[in-house]
Structure formats: C-alpha cells, structure tokens
Amino acid sequence: MLSSLSPHLSNVRQTLTQVLNFALVLSTAFMMWKALSIYTNSSSPIVVVLSGSMEPAFQRGDLLFLWNRSPRAEVGEIVVYNVRGKDIPIVHRVVRAFGDDARDPKEGGGKKGKSASGTGKKESVAAGAVHSDSSFVSHKLLTKGDNNIADDTELYARGQDYLDRKVDLVGSVRGYIPAVGYVTIMLSEHPWLKSVLLGLMGVMVILQRE
C-alpha cells in the first residue's frame, strides 16, 4: 500500500517544492522593489512610458528610473507626477518653477505664465504612485509634454494651477532603457495575452513535473 502511495507523495512534494520556489522568487522581487523604493525615496522607482507625449525624448515602452531625494526640480528636468484624485502618473518636463515657500505664485511668488498655448494634449502616462517626504520644502512646478501644444494645466486636478514638489511628484527621471517595458503596454492593451502567459506557465509546470 505504501509503495502505491509513494508516487503520489512524490508528486505532492514536487508540487510543493515548485510552489515554494515560485513564492521565494516573488518575495525576493518584492523585497528588492521595497529596498529600491527606500533608496530612491519613491514609491514607484521604475515606471514605463505608456504614451507619446514626451517624444522624441522618450518613446512608448521606455523604462524609466526615478530619483526622489532632491528637494527641488529644475526647469528642463523630466519628472513623473501623480494627478490628484486619480491613479494617473504622468511623465512630463518642468517648464516653470516657483519659489521655495508655500505661497501661491499668483500672490507672492510671481505670476505664472504658460509656456505655450493651444488645446490638443496627450499624456505620457506611467505606472506608479505618488510618494511624499516631509523633509521637502514646498516647491511649485508647471509641466508640459515635449510633444504637446499646451502645458499641463488642464491635466491637473480641478482648481490646481501647478504641481507641489512635495505632494505631487513621484520622482525625477535619472536614467532609462529603451523599449524594454513595451510588454506592459501589450498586456494592458490586449488582456487576452495575460491568459496566454498564464497558460504557458501552467504548461511549463506540467512539463517540469513529467
């Protein structure tokens, strides 16, 4: 009887080993992500460009590496910010920067001027979330996509004329790898690909057991 159960027990042990190995891979990846998040001071230190509003600087599918430990963002710097009230992080360039106090630029920090005029806009959206740190001073920013006609005022939350460095920014772009994040775009635009990948993973597990 024990001899007849032995193959089944062996299969169970093999399955448990594969599950534990998979869990170990996931937990290791999660710990590496959290460590990178702490090091960069950004809750989303790596993001993928999902639209063409920053062309030619960045293309869809480019993988961006962020840094969020600088107290200021300078004019010309490319940043990722979060739209308040929406889970829509956007990759755009700083075109105006206002002082280090919390006053409205219209009242005490200078009048805000738009860098361009027009109506048509595209958003360079990236996967990620906003992260703030109380050590940052208040710093107001106006952003714009390089491939857009107008600045981002219409993209901001209602009643918001500029970004707050402390509240809205996910981080500043410090490096990138072209195109490697395009698989993220494919999975978001074609949900059926997720099912195909899961099916392939299941087949691989079965083949490994054999």
Curated annotation (Swiss-Prot):
Catalytic residue list: S53, H92, D152
Annotated segments matching region Disordered: 101-124
Enzyme class, first EC level, given as a word: hydrolase
Lumenal side: 32-210
Biased composition (Basic and acidic residues): 101-110
Reaction it catalyzes: Cleavage of hydrophobic, N-terminal signal or leader sequences from secreted and periplasmic proteins
Keywords: Endoplasmic reticulum, Glycoprotein, Hydrolase, Membrane, Protease, Signal-anchor, Transmembrane, Transmembrane helix
Spans traversing the lipid bilayer: 15-31
UniProt-annotated stretches for the region C-terminal short (CTS) helix: 196-207
PROSITE patterns the record matches: SPASE_I_1
Domain of life: Eukaryota
Keyword Transmembrane: yes
Molecular function via GO: serine-type endopeptidase activity
UniProt main location, coarse: endoplasmic reticulum
Topology in the lipid bilayer: Single-pass type II membrane protein
EC code(s) of this entry: 3.4.21.89
Glycosylation sites: N41
Cytoplasmic side: 1-14
GO biological process: protein targeting to ER; signal peptide processing
Similarity comment: family membership: Belongs to the peptidase S26B family.
The protein's role, per its UniProt record: Catalytic component of the signal peptidase complex (SPC) which catalyzes the cleavage of N-terminal signal sequences from nascent proteins as they are translocated into the lumen of the endoplasmic reticulum. Specifically cleaves N-terminal signal peptides that contain a hydrophobic alpha-helix (h-region) shorter than 18-20 amino acids.
Description of its domains: The C-terminal short (CTS) helix is essential for catalytic activity. It may be accommodated as a transmembrane helix in the thinned membrane environment of the complex, similarly to the signal peptide in the complex substrates.
Protein name: Signal peptidase complex catalytic subunit SEC11
Organism: Uncinocarpus reesii (strain UAMH 1704)
Lineage of the species this protein comes from: Eukaryota, Fungi, Dikarya, Ascomycota, Pezizomycotina
Protein encoded by which gene: SEC11
